[in-house]
Amino acid sequence: MNKVRGNRIFNYFWSVSFFLVALFETVNAQPYNSERYSKVMWNYLEVLSEFGPRYVETEGYEKTLRLIKRVGGEFADEVLEHTFFVKQHDGGQRQMVNIEFIFNGNAEGRPILLGAHYDTRPFADQESNPVLQTHPITGSNDGGSGTSVLLGLAQYLKEYPIKQPVRLLFFDGEDFGQSGSGEMFLGSKYHADFLRKESREKWPQAVIIVDMVGDKDLEIFKETYSMASGPKILDRIYNVAKRMNSFQFNEKSKYTIQDDHLPFAGLGIPSVVLIDFDYPYWHKLSDTLDKCSPESLSVVFSVLVGVLLEW
């Protein structure tokens, strides 16, 4: 699972340089400092990891909400809070919230939605020790990496506005319940239900979810639900990655994964997830910052920027 690749640092800087040259030749884009954005995203991931567990009603959760809303207030054209309630087994309710950043662009048409969950697993259910299974995880990669990439994109979209309308959506409750309980992907399910009540003209034309994209040994295969729902989106993404000479994007299919893209795919919206599921620390207490890499965040960020510019 934990594959080793040689000469990673050289390959990373060569791939980013190759990508930028190719991108500026094919797209009327302004050059940007990729190293700067890499540091920005890594700083966010450091902060999120320092917050500790970030599931609803924890201190880390509240700090994360404040961070996301502060970044949105600084960079987005508008910030929306979508509050919803989850029924508890004791008959009570628990409040959760999705945060949406709106970037209007200057072109007509439906927006592109990029999403990530910001919550973390309340229990380490993949630990072999039953005692450890009751402890909450830090979730540096699972919950932290996707959030950090979206926060970095928010700054980019402010500093280099693009014509395409974009929504950045931070989901609550993705990792809340036991597997198979129906108490997972709560934020994305809520937003899909919210869209059902809206005019289809307001629906996103495409959904791209980023999840677990920060690990040091990053390799993103094509996920099978994504291939069924959004094959053309995957083609866009992997074509950009190919020009970028990014070995982190593998065009083969490997996993079938339930994630935040499925509620939108259920509406008929082309939806995909970018995820590296070959991560031995998934839902374990060892999902910590030292397992992550700023290079991985930067590669995913650069590919997403390229996709947005070419849309």
Please name every model-derived segment.
Residues 100, 111-115, 167-170, 205-211, ...:
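Structural recognition of the beta-strand scaffold that forms the well-ordered cores
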Residues 2-14:
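Bacterial N-terminal signal peptides that target proteins for export
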Residues 206, 213-311:
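Active-site-adjacent substrate-binding region
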Residues 43-106:
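A non-catalytic alpha/beta surface segment that caps or lines the substrate-entry region
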Residues 54-56, 85-89, 105-108, 118-122, ...:
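Solvent-exposed loop/turn segments at secondary-structure junctions
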Residues 14-25:
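Bacterial N-terminal signal peptides
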Residues 31-35, 50-60, 86-89, 132-143, ...:
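Second-shell loop/turn segments in exported
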Residues 134-236, 256, 261:
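Acidic/histidine-rich catalytic neighborhood of metal-dependent amide-processing enzymes
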